[in-house]
Amino acid sequence: GAYGQGQNIGQLFVNILIFLFY
């Protein structure tokens, strides 16, 4: 996302999902 803080949270969330699924 391009919301600044939301970008950080979204990136962490995606990283966790990738870590769990892969």
UniProtKB/Swiss-Prot annotation:
One of its GO terms (cellular component) is extracellular region. The keyword Ubl conjugation does not apply. The keyword tRNA processing does not apply. Hemolymph. It is found in: Secreted, Extracellular space. Keywords: Copper, Oxygen transport, Secreted, Transport. Belongs to the tyrosinase family. Hemocyanin subfamily. This is Hemocyanin subunit 4. It comes from Homarus americanus.
